[in-house]
Amino acid sequence: MDTEREALQCTAYPEVQSFCQRHGLAFEVVDLRWGIPNTQATDYLTTELCLEELERCQKTSIGPAFVALLGDQYGPCPVPRRIEEKEWEALRAQLTSRPRDLELVTRHFQRDDNTIPPTYVLQPSGSLVVPGPEEATLTSVLRGGAQEAWRLGLISQEQWMCYHRSVIEWEIELGLLSSARGDQGATVFLRDVQDLNKHILDDCSLKMVDRLVDGCLDTNAQSLLSGLKGRILDAQPGALKSHHLSWSRDLVNPKNKAHARYLKQLSEQFVARTNHQVLEQLRELELARQELGWLYQEIRHHLWQSTESTKVFCGHQELLAQLRQQLRQDESRTHTPLVLFGPPGIGKTSLMCKLAQQVPELLGHKTVVVLRLLGTSKLSLDARSLLRSLSFQVCLAYGLPLPPAQVLEAHSRVGHFFHTLLHTVSQRNFESLVLLLDSVDDLDSICHSPRVSWLPLKCPPRVHLILSTCSGQQVLHNLQQTLKDPSTYWEVKALSGSQGQEFIQLLLAAEKRMLSPGQRDVLWASLPECGHPGRLRLAFEEARKWASFTVPVPLATTAEEATHQLCIRLEETHGALLVAHVLGYIVSSRYGLSEAELKDVLSLDDEVLQAVYRDWTPPSKELLRFPPLLWVRLRRDLGHCLVRRPVDGCMLLAIAHRQLSQVIQVRYLSGPERAKRHGVLAEFFSGAWSQGIKKLITLPLVGKPLNLDRKVAPQPLWFSSTVANLRKLTELPFHLLHAGRLEELKQEVLGNMSWISCRGISGGIEVLLDDFDMCAPHMNSPEVDLVREAIQLCGPAVELRGLEKSVLYTELLARLLFFAASHPAMIGQLCQQAQSWFRACPYPMLVPLAGFLQPPGGPLRATLTGCHKGITAIAWSLEEKLLVVGTQDGAMVVWDVEEQQVVHVLMGHTAEVKCVRVFAQGTLAISASKDHTLRLWSLLSGQEKVTILDGGSQNPTEPQSWDLHVDERNNVVYSTSGARINMWNLETSKLVFCITGDVSDPWVCVALLAAQGLLLALSKGGQVSLWSSAMGKLQEKHQLSSIKEETPTCAVSIQSRARLVAGFSSGSIALVSAGEDRLLEKLPEAVGFLVVSEDDSLLVAGFGRFVRIFLADSQGFHRFMASDLEHEDMVETAVLGPENNLIITGSRDALIQVWSLSEQGTLLNVLEGVGAPVSLLVRGGTLVVSASRKSSSFKVWDLKSTKKLQSPTPFLDRTGLAAVSHHGSFVYFPKVGDKNKVTIWDLAEGEEQDCLDTSNEVRCLEVAEQAKLLFTGLVSGIVLVFPLNSRQDVLCIPPPEARKAVNCMSLSKSENRLAIAYDNIVLVLDISPGDPCPAIEGPTYTFYTQLPETIVSVAVLADYRVVYGMSDGSLFLYDCACSKVFPLEAHGSRVSCVEVSHSEQLAVSGAEDALLCLWDLQACRGMFEMSYENSCCRGVRCACFSRDDKHVFAGMEDRSVTAWSTVDGTLLAVQFVHAVINRIIPTSNGFMAPTSHGYLIRERFQCPSVRASQQDPLKNFKKAVWLVKTRQREELAAAEASQDAEPVAVEGKESKSNKRSQVCLIL
């Protein structure tokens, strides 16, 4: 059946493989007789291995496990390899009468007394004299003896069958006839050649039937074959697939059309049958699928591994007893985790597994035991996956809510959740929890970080954490740096000599083996007093192969020597080259290789194939593969040296023992060999030689190059639209890197958008970043660094919408387009790939045409989110590089900012944390909370050292100030809360003194003047008090003399001058000291905060939207700059740079502004906070953390960060008034620090081109693109018009009434009408062509709204109709020509924008209630209400129509852009742009919009005429709801019914000609 097998291999197997891959399944064909000579194919060992492989297939395959090709040959009957003693005696008794036959049998078999019971073992034929022709064959002799013994009842029928069954019948019996699955996993393809019996003697049929040695037909074999076919037909008719062929002399000739047709039908039927079986099993699995099936599979895997590890357990009883006692002692107290350590192979794993089995008996049957043998499965390979699976299992075990999706999206949050979960479990005070994590040194990340950030340094009561690791490794050192208590560490020592011998005996007994006394002597002599279980197991692996007649050789005395000895034995048996390459590939792989992958890789290795086919030629002229039998033989001899681990949906083989891996590295992967192994693996996982691509090779017996198909698995990125090739994604970058193929790595992986999106979507952003982190240090490529940072910046958008292609492509394209031209090799190619994907995308999509999102290379270091409420306090531990965060829910979280990981979750406070101070060289922190406790923490151990009940008012509504002052020299802390000052001794936790003030006049601030030994306090009523800081004795009390009738709002101490600077409710700043006070400055508004520099040379005062800087002098402080620093919203906080050359300020509008003090307050940068008011800015070195009370996230900024690659400088508009001209070449906005001027920003150059003086504050801006005019509406009510081609000329439009500020303006689509809106007045003017600039005439019409509310948005049409929206949500259409108003249905809140379509048939209005309304202006009625709500932020900021009026684009309050259909109101696309946009301008194919980040969005909107699935791009959009309501109502009645709201027309059309006098020309 060779032609059939080759046909299936060439055509059927690849098709089934692709089918399985599309369903997320691996497909492996096991045909051990392919590629080897017939003498090996019929070898007794081959038969045994075939049956073993069949059993393995039945255990692992969910679909077909067995396929038989049955023709007209029954095949040879193999001789049993082993015959048990009782059966041997029965056979021998039947042969006593035939001495020659008996002598033949005894010559081939030798007794082995080392088996239990003893057996007779067939000896290899090469060691025997070949029997003469007169002797009966061994097979026939044994058959005769078995026949007689069975007849006499001495052996069973099953034993009799062992001598009469051929290989094919053995396999069909095991694979089909005796299988519990029946025909569900098995198929027999039967080839029936008609009229064959008529041609049985023809030469051409010699190979088609069984024949005897003399060439005669073997009738016995043919009879057995007929019986086998009958059994199959009777027992499993559904599994039998018959193919009837007519006889012909060239039946097996490939050129025979009938035969070719048969082969085609066979292949098609094989594919159909196999695919059907796979689908049937998939349906059953789907019905039985559990929601958390992945978790249950993980748990089962580790339990099975545990059972295997403890099958033979010996020794360590004393250590187990000590561990049990320690667990009992720790049960009711806070304690450190336990760490078991010892050299590799000492028995740590079996000890951990044994302890896991004994824990329930020790701590109670309700104890929850969670065991992980790390590194043995995909979910235990890295800390991120490990914590995820542990959290799920613990939550399930205790009936707690499962981790939410937001937690699982970031490793830092999973770590925080895990820490919190342990405390939650402890507080239940019921069931104990024991976590056992074996081999933490096998975690991917733990070796590379000096701090094990995910590890809880203290376990709460009833929670136990036990780890094991190897001694002498970097991991143990890292653990010792994290867990510093010596009692944490328990050494696992070697067994005693007697225990070592007992261990060997137990291993032999488990295998039903024993040793002869002489062999035992040799074994013990080789292992004098050896108690190392790993070494003992290696010795056992050698000794268990000894038969009683084997003369043993001395074994190696050390584990390393024994490992080398094992390799030598394997090389002698299987060939040095094959062993070196097989083991080299397994060790070189990232996590291991599946058997199918290994066989494919060996089929690509020319050196291996040339060695294999040295003595015979391959069976096929079309394809070349590695003979799988050679691998199975080697795998069998490797035995326990290999371990199977489930990874990426496959069962991978890896080296079980670290010692063996190290020896393989030294022995087989030194020098260039390592790069060669990685190179072949890279070729395989890249798919370079798959899908019919042939590879040249020269085989020894051929002598000429052969170009043959290696038939290896294809390696696409996606097997189907939902199934990614995880194995390729995991392995390829690793092998390209270590093969030194860095350019290929850059082009095909790190610089390939298809790769990036596939890796990100299938594994998540953090897995994608891990790949970049692995490769970047070896590449020295700024481009790679930029792409990595760009991916990291995608985080917020991914959390909002989920990681799907459109999000990732948009995010990266909009960030990397800045660098596409300057770096075309990698970034340019990435951008082109993204653009090509967008062009082919069948869904409505917003496509970036230029960079507009924050580019990589900027100051943002990280955005971190914890599992807690808003952040209320932050402190740095610079020495330990830690950040301590206090939160509203009382949690204290310690972050390693560099690793971006949670180090500790400090649980103790039950209410909001108000204040945190770090001291003792960054090792201790003390916190104050609304729960009126002080808690002292060790930042190294995470342990709470002291709890102090600090007292204070229990009235939650009473306004109080909290503060802490640590005096390290005296080891005391001063806590202030309301009207109480307490001094506590940190060593004894004793109260030293308590100062109680007037409850009705609490202290606003208290300063510790350490140098003077004073406490200085300022009360709400302005009373100054001084006490001795040592004894708390009152020394002075007086009322402020310089400030009257003002309340203190904030204060800061000036330690170098022993003074206090206080801010007051009416803007006063006073300098307060012992015995005196004086007014320092009077600010226009209440002082919100005060900040002083580290050297006391600068003072910062925040008031309203402004910040003022003061410089220290001999008298106190004087103003540093003439102008104040200005925000657009209330300034909340500020911090000074490390050298006083920068100041960073934060405001309620979530913006952070960076100013240069060395350049007199020049604004350097505007940064986006966390989307909530910036309430905290804290600096540590050059890093600044920004946080908010309303967000659980915080951002880390690097002040010294310089741009890695130059990108355009953003324009610094903070007003949201930016206007755009010249098709996006120039941007106009009020000048920073001087709103009486308008900055003209050149986007191409990234610099200010000019500045226009308006003499008054600018309130709004509009650009007439065609007319080239800039309209500036001022707070004075004047509108200045600047011709853009001659900016020295200015037109002035005066206001209708004095001191009325311009609220908004609008131009008609044809730019021939201008509407200017004030609070309740609208002017409509005409714009007509003129020379040198257009003429502005009018106002042609003026009307009043007659409403108390103000106009906030306006739009004008060419026919003098005006649509305007009010502050209360009202919306009106006013026809100036006929002086009529048409009320449109009101919004529920302030109207934020009104826009008219280009045809002026439609209008769209947006409001702060997130509602967009589409209006038919001809019928004056609503068409659609389109609502879009985000759970965090609601509202519409701006909108516009596309040029063809088919779509509406809207800028939303949640920093996203939406696209809607005007035909049916459908939401077509949503794009998160990270920034607020206040204006959208339509372009020919999309829109452009200036952002609050200072970039101009340019996007193309592509909307296929037939939308494939209009909601598909929105399927993952989280936390948002959109709704469309169709409006069906009659046209509105005439406006008489609402005359009270009708505007009053002041000027009519006829007055148009005499209005020019109101416009003056300024030269």
Curated annotation (Swiss-Prot):
What is the protein's name according to its record? NACHT domain- and WD repeat-containing protein 1
In this chain the WD repeats are located at 274-314, 866-905, 908-947, 954-994, 998-1037, 1044-1082, 1126-1165, 1168-1207, 1212-1251, 1253-1292, 1346-1385, 1386-1425, 1431-1470
Lineage per the UniProt record: Eukaryota, Metazoa, Chordata, Craniata, Vertebrata
SMART domains per the UniProt record, alphabetical: WD40
Q: Do you know which Gene3D superfamilies this protein is assigned to?
A: P-loop containing nucleotide triphosphate hydrolases, YVTN repeat-like/Quinoprotein amine dehydrogenase
Q: Where is the signal peptide?
A: none
What processes does the entry annotate via GO biological process terms? Answer: negative regulation of NF-kappaB transcription factor activity; positive regulation of gene expression
An example Gene Ontology molecular-function term? ATP binding
Q: State a GO cellular component annotated for this protein.
A: nucleolus
Q: Which residue ranges does the record assign to the NACHT domain?
A: 336-666
- Quote the subcellular location field of this record: Cytoplasm, Cytosol
Q: Which positions bind ATP?
A: 342-349
- What is the protein's known function? May play a role in the control of androgen receptor (AR) protein steady-state levels.
Say if the entry is tagged with keyword DNA-binding.
Answer: no
Keywords recorded for this protein, A-Z: ATP-binding, Cytoplasm, Nucleotide-binding, Repeat, WD repeat
Q: Which segments carry the region annotation Disordered?
A: 1534-1563
Organism for this UniProt entry: Mus musculus
Matches recorded under Pfam families? HTH_NWD1, NACHT, WD40
Listed under subunit, the entry gives: May interact with HSP90AA1, HSP90AB1 and BAG2.
